[in-house]
Amino acid sequence: MQDGCRPVVAIVDDDEAVRESLRFLLDVAGYDVVTFDSAQDYLDGIDRRRAVCLVVDQHMPNTTGLELLAKLRRLGTGLPTALITGSPTPDILRQAVALGVMKVLEKPLVDDALLRFLAAAAAGDGA
């Protein structure tokens, strides 16, 4: 945790129901959550130094989750990231590994897998 505060998780997903569901789950689990409805919204609005990790949807209009991560990597941001997708194709998995994604989570999400990722990211554990 940072400065004794609750860890901050950034969520980027174009589906409002998913964002709000994740916000509720993570709030109950002890995280502060900031949500964004697009990759551009995230790039424009987040103080990336505050978040301990990023949860990003792959399939969004205009910019996919992997495209957002590629932009962030070019900017030198190595924030621990989980990519969520309903179709984890071999190509998506390959690209995710190349971009340093810590975890690819398949929809529908399993809460325990997401919470394990968040705990590892908040602890600074690359596992």
What are these regions (language model features)?
Residues 20-28:
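Charged docking surfaces used in two-component/phosphorelay signaling
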Residues 19, 61:
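The feature encodes the CheY-like receiver
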Residues 37-38, 64-67:
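Acidic catalytic/metal-coordinating carboxylates
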Residues 15, 58-59:
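The short loop immediately C-terminal to the conserved phospho-acceptor aspartate in CheY-like receiver
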Residues 49-56:
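Active-site beta3 strand of CheY-like receiver
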Residues 91, 109-119:
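C-terminal output helix
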